[in-house]
Amino acid sequence: LANAEARPGVSFRLGGFETPLDGRRATVIRALNVLRQYDESEVEAAWATMRARLAPGGALVEGTCNEVGRVASWVTLEATGPVTFTISLRLAELDAPSIVAERLPKALIHRNVPGERIHDLLTTLDRLWATHARLGVYGPTQRWIAVAESLRAEGWPVLGARSRWKLGELTVPWSAVAPA
């Protein structure tokens, strides 16, 4: 099926983390819902293998999403390692941002426990989502924007601006959620 979408500049190959590219390097490698089946101890090696296949300035996007892509999170990595962590939520029926906990990348999914930064982030997002419930009358987007602004005001290093938040996205540096 994927080969039906091939066109100049876009191709699909069967392969693993080694990313077979016939001697070329990838600008972007997107690996969603791949590492979930692996042990957490295997993540670093898989990341290193894929990062080694990146062109200078290239990026690896590794994460997980639900079946229809409405709840997702990913780590963006460069040649030197993880750079950012992003969550993306369909805001229309969102009960709590922590729904993303079941779709965290393998490097974080077992770290959503008290004392870990990812747990702190998700707990804070839920608290702020509840705090800004009154803004729901203006729509979930306005509520999410208020959450992002409040998160930043509380000292979280939220990256980006309203243009991404309107899409239900929120990005922080990897260091803000990296396992302790």
Q: At which residue positions do the language-model features occur?
A:
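Residues lining the SAM
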Residues: 31-35
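Class I SAM-dependent methyltransferase SAM/SAH-binding core
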Residues: 1-20
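A short acidic, Gly/Pro-enriched loop at the edge of an enzyme's catalytic core
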Residues: 18-29
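A conserved mid-domain beta-alpha-beta active-site/ligand-binding segment of alpha/beta enzyme cores
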Residues: 72-73, 77-146
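Conserved Class I S-adenosyl-L-methionine
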Residues: 125-180
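A short glycine-rich, Lys/Arg-flanked "PGG" loop and its adjoining helix->strand segment in the class I
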Residues: 36, 42-57
